[in-house]
Amino acid sequence: MQTGRTEKIGNVVLDYSHYPEQDFYCDGASEDALLELVKTIPPREYPQEIYKAASWEVLYHLSDLRENIVGWLPVDKSMKVLEIGSGCGAITGSLAQKAGSVTCVDLSKKRSLINAYRHQDCDNVTIHVGNFSDIEPDLPTDYDFVCLIGVFEYGQSYIGGKTPFHDFYRIIKKHVKSDGHIVIAIENKLGLKYWAGCREDHVGTFFSGLEDYPQGGAARTFSRSGLEKILKECGETEYHFYYPYPDYKFMTTLYSDRYLPKVGELSNNLRNFDRDRMLLFDEKKVFDMLIREGLFGQYSNSFLVMTGPMTDIVYSRFSNDRAEHLSIRTDILEKGGKHLVRKYPSNPAAAPHIEALAENESIFTERFKDSTLSVNRLELKRTADGLPFAEIEYLENNRTLEELLDECLQNNDEAGFDKLFDRYCKIAAWKAEGTKQDYDLTFPNICVQSDIWTMIDYEWTTDKLTPQQIISRALNCYGQEDPVRMEHPIVKKHLEALGIGKEQMRELSEKELAFQHFVLQEKDGRSRTALGQLRHLIGNRAVPYQEFFARADRKKVQVFEDFGAGYTPEHSYYQYDAYEADDLINARIICKAGTKAIRLDPAELPCLVQIHGIEWRGKALTRAQLDQCLSTNGQVLADTPSHVPTVLFETGDPNISVRLDCLDNEATDGEALIIRAQIAWLSAEMLQDIQARLAAAARRKGFWFQR
């Protein structure tokens, strides 16, 4: 319902007092489709719509995983939140659920309508539509949190002027309480993903941010030092850096300077939902190196900067790419110099899943009480609104069993690996008969402090697997996560001892897929699709750098020069720029004085070549001239005076020879011979099929091609 300069969609108020009656920022048809979708589909069905659409736009705007970037913030119902650049409402719902009131500002009416329709049940959301600089003077100055999620980089669009980012920040600062917070989530200009071959998020081209945006554009991201420089020059003295991983858009884990990632943790790096990317190196291995060198904070893909007083939360992990009733969040807090762990349900439906942790802890504590394995202590508590959360002992100065096993492999310490693995096997089998098994008793889920081993994860239990199956799963998971591990002789020895060959690995993979299906299955039968699978459905490529070299090698042509003694390797060279498209050759050959003939080898494998034309001395050769000077070592197919010749080369050394001395006198220095052709490379199977077809045609119709 619209009244004057306001409109109400459900409980959400849209304020058009400063709306210029025109949307200056709109994605057109994709936003029209989004608006129709949110008008008719309830939010609980968005996962299925995301799956059906298999598009970046629908995933980006409607995925509940976008909320993770603010889901950990210590916001409560006593607080007011300002969200600048609220867009289609990716995080508005999470803020509204946590805060007393949420004020949104966005330039686009259409995006604001999408936001309002999807959150129409929220009675604490007001959306101001229009330019921020027009709306800002009327906003209160006592917000507890001001959130700019993927917005600060557009400062020059919001403000303009010579120092737009400084001015933008100073204006925002006016609207925060003295003990309040500004929260900025932004890509790191030096993020590792950009070095590794991802396109810059805003410009969409390779290395644009690393090259400092030579083509310009509306957005500017910053390095850590660049952000700190702006904050300091604006007089900000209290700020804290957090590191969303893999990035802030679909964050699963939040690290901080007080809790940095450990070696081996950053392995989820294929996240190019929006565009094709290159794979220039193994990001996990480079992240591991950066962690060891103390440089992770400089190369994190994204930053979250929070100004104001430091919070207790130093780490947060979201396990919510799951069915609703299984979705949880794990926080690590630092209080009085000590750490503690808390696990929260992501929603009320997941409360029983948290409560089950206490039951599992009791079962495993009893089972392992006389073994060499301890069970991490847990206490079930309640939040102010009555939801359960688990408070769990934090183990200081620990290493995981996985880390210790990796160390043995790196040092080729077979005896050390065997000792650790044998102890693990004895633990897995301890008093196993007739009791629950910890399905996820894998190597990363056992912490080692000196000689004390502790089970730290007992979220998933089963009474359907034997200890042998638990052990096989753990070792197979360990190997599958890293090809180097899987190929190591020590790991191969233990896989063989357990009877795990290729067939058994396939069966284990099928069981793993079945478990993932269980985790994604809602209680009402609906199922969500994991982010990794959505990346495949959207269909953007991740192309290894090796393929570029393979394509480059395939697309090189070799030129031979004949000065009267025939073609020899000594008088040959490669042209790497002869291709003007994937299958089009435009070879410009500069001839030396005395050149009598030129041979062009278009490839180093069987192929089909259609010669589009040959130029000599600036003129295209006629058909009569081609008949006089052109020869190949292939079969010319369907050759007619009105048709350019197509040649089948059955050899791995195809060549096209042009005798210049048949056209005129031999070449003088610097004259150009140009050969244009289209090429199709043939695999061995394709060549065999063509040869069989030609032979059959020859038997039926006679000899219809000429050499």
Residue positions per predicted region:
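N-terminal auxiliary segments of SAM/dcSAM-dependent transferases
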Residues: 1-41
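Conserved SAM-binding loop of SAM-dependent methyltransferases across substrates and taxa
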Residues: 88-99
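A short glycine-rich, Lys/Arg-flanked "PGG" loop and its adjoining helix->strand segment in the class I
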Residues: 163-181
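Conserved class I S-adenosyl-L-methionine
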Residues: 183-205
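Catalytic activation segment of kinase domains across protein kinase-like and atypical kinase folds
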Residues: 212-213, 435-487
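Short alpha-helix
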Residues: 217-235, 239-241
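ATP-binding glycine-rich loop module of kinase domains
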Residues: 325-363
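Conserved structural core of kinase catalytic domains
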Residues: 375-421
